[in-house]
From Swiss-Prot:
Source organism (scientific name): Pseudomonas entomophila (strain L48)
Pfam families to which the protein is assigned, alphabetical: Fapy_DNA_glyco, H2TH, zf-FPG_IleRS
Coiled-coil ranges (or none): none
Positions annotated as zinc finger (FPG-type): 236-270
Record protein name field: Formamidopyrimidine-DNA glycosylase
EC number: 3.2.2.23, 4.2.99.18
HAMAP family found in the cross-reference section: Fapy_DNA_glycosyl
Gene name linked to the record: mutM
CDD domains listed in its UniProt record: EcFpg-like_N
Binding sites annotated in the UniProt record for DNA: 91, 110, 151
Listed SMART domains: Fapy_DNA_glyco, H2TH
Length: 270
């Protein structure tokens, strides 16, 4: 599933080609995503100029003069720019055609993504309850420490809770916990302030590094320019269960936490 770095990579890739451009037509070949694409999307968006492209958590907000297209890549989706008129292949559900001669094409083989329309996107039901962005000053270790008091859940699902902080998905939670030396199974409420301060720093560092590398391509993620991400080459623990730790050589263990696989080093993480 594309996580925050992959979505931010997509945003950075498509924004320069969208902002200031006018939409000439929207072609929807299949409306059946996680939620149906609005039947009047073409009417609402065509003729409008794209003002900005923003990201909130794992949602892309394509802001027009009036209204915003809210897009989510789901489990396997991508948005990329192609030449106008390029024939559509299987699973290529939506084309947003631009007067510039390019079009933004949405592909989603598993159809778990979304394309919705809103006049007030930040107050949309999908976005209004989200926590702070991890790469801003609104998120820090003190927030993690305070929100974790009295919580008996494991620390990994705690930091993956979008009400606590957005965008810390399975890959980056696994990597940040390793970097901070924290066992993902530990109770969130039993971790000290000092360790949460360290964890917040590592969450920011890991996410920033992943964005710099264009995200992580494990299966079918590609950025807005059609290129894969390269952060998978930097992974220390994610997806490496049973292999030796890159730091100490101990065999990495894999357990289930919150229905997700979690890999950790029993020596480096306490």
């Amino acid at each position: 599933m594309p996580e925050l770095p992959e979505v931010e990579t997509t945003r950075r890739g498509i924004a320069p080609h969208l902002v200031g451009q006018r939409v000439s037509r929207v072609v929807v070949r299949d409306r059946r995503l996680r939620w149906p694409i609005p039947e009047d999307l073409d009417v609402r968006l065509s003729g409008q100029c794209i003002v900005s492209v923003e990201r909130r958590a794992k949602y892309l907000l394509i802001n027009a003069e009036v209204g915003t297209l809210i897009s989510h890549l789901g489990m396997s989706g991508n948005l990329r720019l192609v030449e106008l008129g390029l024939p559509a292949a299987k699973h290529e559900h939506v084309d947003i055609e631009l007067e510039s001669g390019l079009m933004l094409r949405y592909t989603d083989p598993r159809r778990f993504g979304a394309m919705l329309w809103s006049l007030d996107p930040l107050n949309h039901e999908l976005l209004i309850r989200l926590g702070p962005e991890p790469l801003t000053d609104l998120f820090d270790g003190e927030r993690l420490f305070q929100l974790s008091r009295g919580r008996s859940m494991a620390v990994k699902p705690f930091i993956m809770d979008n009400a606590v902080v957005v965008g810390v998905g399975n890959i980056y939670a696994t990597e940040a916990l390793f970097a901070a030396g924290i066992d993902p199974r530990r109770e969130a409420g039993g971790i000290s302030r000092a360790r949460y301060l360290k964890l917040a720093i590592e969450i920011k560092r890991v996410l920033a590094a992943a964005i710099e590398q264009g995200g992580t391509t494990l299966r079918d993620f590609i950025g807005g320019d059609g290129q894969p991400g390269y952060f998978q080459q930097e992974l220390f623990v994610y997806g490496r269960g049973g292999q030796p730790c890159k730091v100490c050589g101990t065999e990495l263990r894999e357990v289930k936490l919150g229905q997700r696989a979690s890999v950790f080093c029993p020596k480096c993480q306490r």
